[in-house]
Amino acid sequence: MEGTTNKDIGSGSSRPGGEVSVSDEIQRRFMEKKWVWAPSSKEAYVCGFVVKEEGDVLEIDCRGVIVRHKSCEVFRMNPPKFDMVDDLAELSYLNEPGVLHNLRRRYQNGRIYTYSGLFLLAINPYKDLRIYGEKDARKYTLSKKYELEPHIFAVANEAYRLMLSNRENQSILITGESGAGKTENTKRVVEFLAMVGGCKGMEVSIDRQIIDANPILEAFGNAQTVKNDNSSRFGKFIKIKFNGGNICGAHIEKYLLEKSRVTSQNRNERNYHIFYQLLGCDDQMLKKQLFLDGEPKDYRFLKDSRFKIPDVDDAKEFRSLRESMRVLGIGEEEQIGYFKIVSAILHLGNIEFREKDGAAEIANLDVAEKACKLLSIPLAEFIKRLIHPVIKAGNEYVAHSRSREQALKIVDGLSRILYDKMFEGVIDRINMSLDSPHKGNFIGVLDIAGFEIFEKNSFEQLCINYTNEKLQQFFNHHMFILEQEVYRQENIEWDFIDFGLDLQPTIDLIEKSNPIGILSYLDEECVMPMATEKTFLGKLMKNIRDEKFEVDKIRDAFVLNHYAGDVEYTVDDWLSKNKDSHSEALTSLIRASGSELVSRLSLNEEAVKKGFFRTVSQKHKEQLASLMSELRRTNPHFVRCIIPNLEKSGEHLDNGIVLGQLKCNGVLEGIRISRQGFPSRMGHREFVQRYRIMMKEKILVDESWDEGVCMELYKEIGGKILSEIGISTSQYRLGRTKVFFRQGVLADIEDMRDVKVSEVVKEIQALIRRRLAFRKYNQAQRRMQGILVIQRNGRICCDLQRWNWWRLYLKIKPLLDVRKRDGEMKEKEAMIQEYARMLDAEKSRREEVEDMLKAMSLKRELLEKSVEDEKRFSMEKDELLMALRYKSDETAQELEKARKEVFDGHEERKMWETRVNEVAIQLEEKDSEILRLRREVSEQKGALSQQEKEICSLREEVVSKLSEKDAMVEKMLRERDSEVQALKEKVKEKDAEVERILEGMKRMEREGEERNRMLKENESTIDELRTRCLNMKRWKDEYAELREDYEALQKKLKDEVEDMQVENDRLHNEIRKISKEREELGRMQKKLLDDLEFERNRGSKLEKAFQELRGEYEAVEGQLQKERQFRDSTQESLLEKTRGLERRVKSLNEKLRREEMANRQLMSEKDEMYREIHVLQQSKLDEIFDREAGFNSIKKNLQMEIQRLEMENQRLSVDLMEAKCMGEASEESISATERFCGMLEEERKKRKEIEYQASEHENRNVILSSEVEMLREMVEMERRSKEEVIRGHEKETGLCKAIAGVRKEVEDLGNEIDMAIEGFNGMYLNVLDGYKRDLKECKEQVMSKEQVIEELNGRIVRLGREVEERKEIEEEMSRKVHGLMKQYNGVMNDFSLLSTKCSSLERTVSEKEEEIKGYSERCSEYDKRFEGLVCRVDEEIENLRRSDEERRRCVEKLESGLNGSIAGIRKLDERYKARIEECAQSVLDGERRKLKAMEELCEQLSKKLGELEEEHQGLLDEKMKGLLRIEQLEGELCAFRESEVHRQDMISMYESEISTLKRCTRFKDEVLGSLSGERNPVVVHVSDKEKCQVLDRKRMTVEHELARANDERQSLMAINKKLREEVEKLRGEIDAGRSKMLEMKKKLGCQSLAVGHLSRELEEEREMVRFFRTLGGARKKKV
């Protein structure tokens, strides 16, 4: 069942109310059986269906296993539509397995948030779901809580919105176990509120400070646990304050810090993060200052913990911590103060004790001394108060000794309280930074541990569970009060029930003081002498009599009944934990610390009255009471976080773990409380719109009705719907704005709606199926008509393919472009040679610059070494001074200590006096030594000043030398510029494209000059050297990037050149294809026009027939059924005719085969006669050639005669249509226009394609230009930064006098400056070495590239040799071709010998010569007419060129007018054809004996035809106007054919069209002859309709072709120009040396292409030879 009800509906879409739309099949399968949830030991619950019911026992099939359970142990399963609902309160059956199943489905689909009544459940995903971005946050700010998916942002936005609208404080309570995601959700809430209410324009905004407070809290308050790598070990309540809608401040309160973690942790856990971050930081000076020289394993408080967290860098986190402190205004000194306390705690833990005479003694005083120095307390006093404390006994103070164990406990207690107070101090400091004087509303975020039930629960768990008990009581009270308030506002009858005291007995049992509760008894035992945990447990057992409390004597524990279950608490160490004991003597010592920060840690103890003792439980109760009072003054929002599993895996949920947390969080209880009344609700308008389909009567509801005005009307309609579907009034309530339902009622209504919708859907499906059937039938009819048209077009295409002249044209056309390509190849080779010369010059210049750089780097290294020696010497002196100062400090401390001891006793005075004298002598000696050292220091300072002067002189010398080098380099660069300018002038004369490349190179050179000049000017000071080092590093990266860009551009340019070559070939092929299609379309157009003329003639004949059939109109109406039958018979007759034509084609094929057999026989006879006529070969050669010419002329004259006969046939058909001459002329012009329009459209398409390619190239150019611009901006930024450094240096020179006044401050900062310079020198040397290595690598690469170039030159030479060899082979092949021609002549001689035996043919030829002369005269007339046509076309081309501007203005008007005319003509033709077809069908279905009766019908039809003819004539006039405009468009197209090549192409196209028309005319005559016996007008008009449709389609195709051809011609020049510009830009950015390699590769590619062209030409010549052979065979056959 789970597979059917869960997985199948997982893809359903959400519906109102939270349901998921499921298929009818899934719903039906669910309804067939009674599905339930049965308990399981492994999975908690499994799904199954009831097989059998036996009283109270059910047999359930759980995945094929039959189990038996009582009815009270199983739970009903929710329908599939409620899977993955957003709110658990919407479930039809509320139970543990139902809630668990819904949460599991949502978790598996990445939905970790789910509403549960009025609060939000959040399950830890253990992975990044990318649902917390700024885009997601913005989406939730624009929506209300329940409009989008459940999310923590929705809760935060709801709180923010209510705060602004109601002016009421809000709170968000986030609870859950450790590792459930509380801290992460708290961070998300704070980030969301900071984004929504952040202020702009401030230097450090308050929202940024609030966000940066989190790393500080995590460092000092978070630690790694078994369940969580970043677990918060304290509770916090963050109040974010708002002034209006903007954040103005914040305040943080902390609860229940886990102090025991400071001194001990579990094996797989860590201490607080700050300890590991300090030990792992990179700041060695700081660690030295804190005396931290070890690793975590070297410290007692850390050695038993885990040292590292996977994927966490402690050093990086420490840097982030210090940055956050800086943002919050915590200064450097204050930061070090906090770090000193943390370090002191580590050192306190490392103090070792040993037993001596029954008392403890410190074994490692140095560690204790470090801790005391960090805390600024005296070591002796610390040891005294730790080991030998003074206790007041009566009026006297008695000193006693502590044992080793006691001392360790005191140290651990001191460490815990130090950390606790320090953490409080950190939070107070954060609050001081985030404080605001504005008083406004706030949003509080509570992050506190959730309810905990462990195997062993102690005092900490009681405090946590007590806190959650109070929060749960607060939740119950708030939630149900709010729910009942909604009922009151909606005017629903309701008896108010107070649920606020449900948990009060347990709370009183813990906290109440009268009668005494558990915590009160604990406080009482803490102040009683000799009290233990057993006495505490005995008091509880004796005095507490409550059903919620139970004592376990065996295990020293008691059981307490909480809202989430019974919890057993063990009382081990409760007294010590509640006392939180520590040494008052040590606390007072810390209060007297010399460090202000340390002394402030215990100031709060001074405010406590003497003798007043406050336990941990009392403090916690006070804090919790304050928190609860704070929450009661706010409007709360609840978030419960849940751990899915213990493996930290985001793949599955552990049912047992999740159920346990649901119980602890009180999820089910909360849902049940929210469902006591009417949990399901829906607005009246929404309810009516969704469920009005269930009404029997139609309800007219206008969507534009205002909901507020028509609320009563919606309410009334909703009541009618509920009463009509049979819902009892006890199951719902009609409120003022909403309708409320009991549990499960809305699910039942939804089921009824699904049934109704399924019925309606079935009716709709039936209608759709009927419509689809009709559509399918109509498509079959149209498909049959299309098949007929395709058959006819296919036959015409086959005829064209068999035409020999067309084949010859296709073979010869590619040979015309070979000569152009040779010229282009020569130009490219010249460019390659020029670039090679430029590359050589650039290489020589580069080598000179590299030599200069080497010399400069050597001098710089010497200077740096000298500076480094001086710095080392000064550092040694400073260290010596520090040692002397340290000794003097120690001496002073000893002196002070001695002076104090003098006044302690009279008996030791003499001894101390002698010791004082000794010390005085030592002091004098040390004073003298100090004076001596001071003199040495002064001498060293003098030497240091002298060395500084020397360094200044050395710097000046370096600057002068560098300036000389600059001048030399500039001179070389000027010479280089002059050479470049000369090269530019030469290249400019040859090619403008190369000039642009050289200009780009010149710009790059100027930029390089400026960069070098700026760099050398800034090397005068140490700061300039540092800037130079950084710039060199950045330039190194830029060089690497430019090198990568160059390689990418090189590859890209190569690919583009190859693509251009391929594209060029493709364009040539497309041009040939277009010309072929254009000729084919022209022939088809002519044929269609002729067919149309023929059919119009047939139409005129039909008009006469209609006059004879006038009286049969009424009788025809009764013959409709017969007409259908006759239509079918007509189709059958057409099919029979088609079969007859196919048989005729077969017969022609048979005839062709017989002719081929005869040809073979003749060839065999020719071979036999070859030996006989060999003697007569030379004598008859001339005669045979003459006769061959005669035969060709006869053949040509015969063809011309056929054409003349065809033209005469056309004239006769035109004479028959004298009344429609104008119409025919207009139609001819239309066809011509359509042909040119098609050509125009084709040109437009090609132009678009080429423009698209051009746009791609432009995009590439834009990208490259942007990269160049970026590099220029980087150079400009470097220039500005260096100018600023220069200005700063000038200011520094002006401040030299002030430097003398602050010489002492400079000496104090000398150490830091020396360290910085030393680090800079090391970094500079490393970068310089890297730069040298890069230069060396560049040289090696240049050498390798030169070798590659030499190898390429060798390959070029070899290829040249191969080309010469191929040329020789070609010449040899040409000689073979000449030999073949000779053989061909021999064959022709054989033909002449064969003709001597065909005397009868010669006589026939002589008889036909006179006829041929007549034909030749007619052909000459046709030639004259054709020449006149060509002249006319040329004149039209000239006229159209002049009208180019006018065409551009009226092209759009012409197209719109043409489209209108075409549409009108097409409509009229369709009407005309439809009517003609109808009449023709009626006539053909009648019998000949009824002709007289149909005369009236024919008269009426003739009248209608006359009217139609008049309408058609009017439309033809409109066509003529459109055609005049189209002729202008045609002329504009011809304007682009300026060259002689294009004019010759047009002439050849016209010739091919004329010949094609003649062939089409002959084919038409044959078809007309075959169909002349048919008298079926229906066939005529059917073909007329089909031909008109084909004509329209062909016209549109020709228009598209014409437009595309025009666009292609216009865009060829543009794309060529753009490609050239792109190549110029690319070449300008590529290094000259590597460009030579690229050009060599291009040259090789061109040569390979040339070889390919030569091979193709050779193959074409072979094809020509074969063609002439076949032509000779044809001639032989004719002879």
Swiss-Prot record:
Q: Which residues bind ATP?
A: 176-183
Tell me which stretches of the chain form a coiled coil. 823-1644
- Tell me the domain of life: Eukaryota
Q: Does the keyword ATP-binding apply?
A: yes
Gene Ontology biological process terms, A to Z: actin filament organization
**Name of the protein described by the UniProt record:** Probable myosin heavy chain ECU04_1000
Please give the family membership noted in the entry.
Belongs to the TRAFAC class myosin-kinesin ATPase superfamily. Myosin family.
Residue intervals of the Myosin motor domain = 83-754
Q: Which CDD domains does the record cross-reference, listed alphabetically?
A: MYSc_class_II (cd01377)
Q: Where is this region: Disordered?
A: 1-22
Please name every pair of cysteines joined by a disulfide bond in this record: none
- Keywords associated with the record: Actin-binding, ATP-binding, Coiled coil, Motor protein, Myosin, Nucleotide-binding
Residue spans of biased composition, Polar residues class = 1-14
Residue stretches making up the Myosin N-terminal SH3-like domain: 31-79
Where are the stretches annotated Actin-binding? Answer: 624-646
Note the InterPro entries from the entry.
Answer: Kinesin_motor_dom_sf (IPR036961), Myosin_head_motor_dom-like (IPR001609), Myosin_N (IPR004009), Myosin_S1_N (IPR008989), P-loop_NTPase (IPR027417)
Q: What is the lineage of its organism?
A: Eukaryota, Fungi, Fungi incertae sedis, Microsporidia, Unikaryonidae
Q: Which GO terms describe its cellular component?
A: cytoplasm; membrane; myosin complex
| Record SMART domains | MYSc (SM00242)
